[in-house]
UniProtKB/Swiss-Prot annotation:
Residues 11-36 have a biased composition (Acidic residues). Gene3D superfamilies: Winged helix-like DNA-binding domain superfamily/Winged helix DNA-binding domain (1.10.10.10). This is Forkhead box protein D1. The keyword Nucleus applies. It comes from Xenopus tropicalis (Western clawed frog).
Amino acid sequence: MTLSSDMSDVLAEETDIDVVGEDDEPRAEEEEDEDLHGDLLPTSPQSSATKDPYKGTGGGGGRSALVKPPYSYIALITMAILQSPKKRLTLSEICEFISNRFPYYREKFPAWQNSIRHNLSLNDCFVKIPREPGNPGKGNYWTLDPESADMFDNGSFLRRRKRFKRQQAPELVLREPGHFLPASAYSYGPYSCAYGIQLQPFHPHSALIAFQQQQQQARQQPPSLPPMAAPALMPPAAQDLSRTCTFYPHQLSPAALPPSLQSKSSSALARSTFSIESIIGGDLNPGQCNSPKAAGVPVISRALVTFSSSQAAAALGGTLQPGTVLTNH
């Protein structure tokens, strides 16, 4: 009887060692801890003689047996998001999945919750989705970037190929200059900028290309010459009217002219009976128009707009004599 009981005890000890899989170093550390506790707490000789280092930790054996899973926080978050029906979860839902799946994190909660939050914010493979206005709750949703599908090696969450970095292809930058600019930059609420007037998207590449195109067009187009009238084809009276019409839109103050041009302009003004006052509605007699005071008033050739078709034909045909005054009808 005694031999069989002794053999069963030896087999039980060997089985426990194989299951736990601990080497000599942890055993030595546990023995040192037990020695420290033994110095502080009194023990009986029988208990010290029959004490087993693996059975002495019966109260905390379940807690110490919990092993941390060999997955990174990115892998844990990816697991949680992929198992959800809508492929999106909030921070609290991600932590709930990890706690339910792994007892180690359930025992350590909430010490690792901030680590999950930091990994969601700092890694480009996770995209934040704002909560819908009609969906009550707290916190935003998190989902996976579509381009991060091959982030893990052969679909194994134990190995990750490389850190995922969200990048934009160079050809898309040149093809769509305003791709990086958000739509909110060009709109004010649901009506957009100025209720439907869309601003052109600005990008340094597009601005540089537009500037180069403008320079090329400026080199290709010949400089345009100002139109010049042919004085030989017009009668003298029509020449005076054309000179008066083409001069005063550029310079409305005859006082600023040189003396030689002031005499010519005053003679042209004396032959015309139309002034600024006549256009506004004031009536001036011929004496006031021919006076020196009236000669200094700038004149706009209203006769080119208001005279009759018969007088225009006579002027162009050469029958209008110099000095003839055109009257307004």
